């Protein structure tokens, strides 16, 4: 079972918070619940809060009149906000949708800005978080351009293992619908099905050889 992070742990991941900041941050965060496929942040609307995922899984999605793209997935401890809204007061270019039943904390921009005036380390937290997000997006872009769909799938299943375990894929597809997973990989659902079949057959051959 995935460990559910505390707000203190999320703060400490990107700064050295004072006890007062931890207390104030915790009091300011409102816990919300989302059902599967609920919209947490609406595309093309002004976002007015930071979203911190406590449990569950979300996706960052972009829609046009005739297409839909899944850009990234979010899990426990991930933070999201629309920087177009936070910096410029403009509508969000992206949306956030729950893939599973999820819990998330929300902190309004107004409250967050008030806290930055009292706690400079919160600015450090935001800066370090944004640098981490930039690094993640760079990695995602390079992986998308330089790796095959099969390699991208293996990376998503388990970043720490270079081999394929069929049960990992089965677990992932029970959480993430094939349509959404194919969007993320930049392939069609039928191509995803072929890749899955090839990987499972390869894994069986490797198991038989040992």
Model feature map: region roles:
Residues 37, 48-59, 76-77:
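Glycine- and acidic-residue-biased ligand/ion/polar-headgroup-sensing regions
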Residues 30, 57-62, 104:
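Short beta-strand segments in beta-sandwich/barrel cores
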Residues 156-210:
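Phosphate-/nucleic-acid-contacting segments
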Residues 73, 107, 136-139, 152-171:
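Functional cleft and adjacent loop/helix regions within the main domain
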Residues 40-45:
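Short phosphate-coordinating micro-motif centered on Lys-Gly-acidic
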Residues 111-148, 152:
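A small-molecule sensor/coupling module
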Residues 1-36, 79, 85:
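Cyclic nucleotide-binding regulatory module and flanking cytosolic helices
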Residues 72-128:
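Cyclic-nucleotide recognition modules
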